[in-house]
Amino acid sequence: KDYIDRHFAEEFSLQQMADALHVSPYYLAHVCKEATGYSPLQYVLRRRIGEAQTLLITTDLPVTRIAAQVGYDNPSHFNAQFSKAVGMPPRTFRREYVYHK
């Protein structure tokens, strides 16, 4: 969990993470699921979306910049992942938060 929290914005590979932690990918997946309730990939995605939500609320950075900052090379993919996780696109999320604040 700590490793993912420090490296969530970097390119993700279960094998790469397992190598960095000197464990097998199977063991890493098992421990991550046990500790967080999510697979490593699910946890990375949730961590990225959570950080994006924070940046959308606390900064005026453009959505494309936020996408890059949380580890997405493709802003369209970020928009799709964010919408799937949150139920609305990032711009709408920001607008709704500011409106209800």
For every predicted segment, state its role.
Residues 1-2, 20, 25-29:
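An amphipathic alpha-helical interaction segment
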Residues 2, 6, 11-15, 34-76, ...:
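Terminal helix-turn-helix DNA-binding modules in bacterial transcription factors
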